[in-house]
Amino acid sequence: MPLQSGGMETIMAEIIKTFKEEIPAMRFIGKKYPNFGPWWGEWFANGWFDLIEETMGGSDAILKIWKNGAGYIGLERRSEGQPFEYHIGMLTPANTPVPEGFEFIDFPAIALGTCWIYGKENEVHNTSKCRSLVTDLGLEIWKDDKDGEWSFENCLCPRYTTPDDKGNIILDYCYFVKNI
């Protein structure tokens, strides 16, 4: 949707699809950080995504149970009156061994409310409209036992990694939602 800014029209990223998908129980393996930041670079430099893929038996192991698996994940937890949590890692099959130096979070079989955000790489990370679009589908955001809401950026190959002929990519942004 075009926006007017200083008399000039600017095209920003847009949400092109919102949908519900079912996922099996999975284990997130990664590291926790105090906020968004330059942490992604160390993941690539240290080969940590490769290590997690090897630990789960290759990316095919997750793709067998979730067609949108094998993405690099920026996992977020928000709850009123509690500190924001940010984790980087990958979702793996349940019970995947956790490499030394990493943490894990087990998620039950559940559903996701997913938005596809289409645009330039530096534009697609504005996820502010996704929550309302997910709830507009009649989906209820799932909360953990401490009242926290979980969501994540799912950076999938090739949707996220290979720009189209316009130089745009698609970022999957997902909320854990109740399986109604």
Q: What do these predicted regions represent?
A:
Residues 2-180:
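A solvent-exposed interaction/effector surface
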